[in-house]
Amino acid sequence: MSWGSLCLLSACDAGHGRQVEAALLLAGKNRIELQKVLEHYKEDEEKYRATCFLIENMPFYGFYEGKALENYHKYYEILSDTLCNAQIVADSLEKADGPFSLSQLTYKRDIETVDSAFLVNHIEWAFKVRREQPWGKNVSFDDFCEYILPYRIGDEPLSAWREELYNRYNPILDMARTSTEAEDPLFAARLLYDSISKIQVLYTTVQPLGPHVGPSVVDYRAGPCRDFTDMMTYAFRAVGL
């Protein structure tokens, strides 16, 4: 997801800036939750600016929810567990549950839904890797906001995924942290990419037309190119790359 292509990062001067205020106007009753986060980080300039960045972009994003989403995920679960022919799995599920359609789901907007606890959790974990990883100092703040900070990739359901995926992927980079190249983000990124690339996956172009799967894609390890791109994105963000 290219957040910056939709809305340029503001310095949040003069309070929280016009773009943030415009987003807050769209938040409705949820405005108070977002303002809690701005207040929470008012003494930490970087975290405050990061909060502004996320809030500015929230009007452009949302997610789907509904019971039909369970059937959509069932496709990935079966495919991952059995490694069956993807077309057979898709046809069997359609016969059992009927065709999947986004019209069966309810769309919710981030700006009206994201609460303060959720947002603080993501910001804290994003800054943990920014400030603790040796390569973090060599990732510009703009790049951090654009590629590491976002809590979502597309239209997947909201979830607090950072801690779990940090604990999963961070040990892979123990060697990077003790290397003479520890401060080089590219060096760490290559190590992580090489490690993840060795995982057995099932690639298929057969897929019900639906939203992004979300962080569970790292467990499914099956699907089309979009899902493997998402898997890499979650892993890299979780460790500050």
Show where each model-derived region lies.
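Bacterial N-terminal signal peptides
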Residues: 1-8
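N-terminal accessory/pre-domain segments preceding catalytic cores
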Residues: 12-189, 194, 217, 238
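Active-site neighborhood of thiol-dependent amide/isopeptide-bond enzymes
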Residues: 176-241
